[in-house]
Amino acid sequence: MGCQVCRQTEPEANFLLPDRDIKNLDIQTQNSSEKKEVSNNFINTFENVLPTFGNYFGSDFNTLISPKIQEYMTEHPQSLPEGLIDNTHIYEMKAVEFTNGNVYKGGWNSDIKMEGQGKYYLKDVNVLAEGVWKEGNLIYGRVFISKENDLFDIYEGKIRFSTFNGKGKLILSNGMIYEGDFEDGEKNGNCKIIFEDGTIYEGQVEKGVLKGDGKMNWKNGYEYEGSFQNNKLNGRGVLKGPTGDIYEGEFLNNLFNGNGKYTYSNGNSYEGQFLYGAKKGKGIYKCNNVFEYDGDWDNDLPCGIGKLSDWEKNWIIKCSWRYGKIVEEPIYEKGDSDNLKNIDLNIIPEKMNLNIRDLTNIENTETQSTQYKLVTMASFLDDY
């Protein structure tokens, strides 16, 4: 009955929590020709492009710890030592151990509520909460959740109404760090996230998901700055690859989609329309200082009506294409038609594709093996 108040020092706690699963990154491969992997280049080489943060942490304190503290104090006022109640003072106790094994060390006010600096250890959930208490609630401090091998997950920051509110930091035992804004227990506002592998995100989150403007720097040298929606690249942005390739334009669910410009590291470029990661619609491909193609595209190939010309427009050939092959007699609009007829126009698209393939000859074999996968940025900052 009651609590034991005879302890002179804070009892040692055996912090051993069962392992908590973190959701695996959802990797999906799209085989449909309508949703082609992104532009034969670098965005589709991302593997584990967003390390997962998972449905993790938070409920322990928000729904378990604080209510249990308040409940126990309300139900067991008789367990407090005689002489504790006073109308004018905050009383300091070295340690109070309750019959259920919970331990509190710190200040109390005259209403028998925790006040001032204090530590509370909850035995049944193996959690330690310490910091500044007011009227029985932790308002700023740290919450420790033990992991295997003497490691801890830690929250440090502001707490309001038993939930994380304001500025705070989550430090997970695997090395991942979230630092930024919380609102009613959710990650909401501006933040910086450092992943276990060194990937860094800085930007906005809304209700636990990437949404708004942000920057992502991957450990393999890729950089993105632009708009995020639902944990994915959505809207306008700039994506840079480690070999010097740059895409600037519109994204839809991580894919080049809409109007954009792709500049290769050798100076070649495509500017025009994309659909599901492939060149489709109107666009201009420029082979640096050699030739350009201006016309219709489908599935990354000339398809429809378009014009080939040299860099300075000294000759122009109007062609009808079907997936990279001439299907009608070309019209020689400008230049020496006799000489131009000696050009095998069907090899032009092949040269375009060779340029692209050369650019994807990345030394990292692991990256090569994934360059024809569509890796989706799936669950990242779920509500906890």
List the predicted regions and their residue ranges.
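Intrinsically disordered, low-complexity repeat tracts enriched in Gly/Pro/Ser/Thr and acidic residues
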Residues: M1-Y384
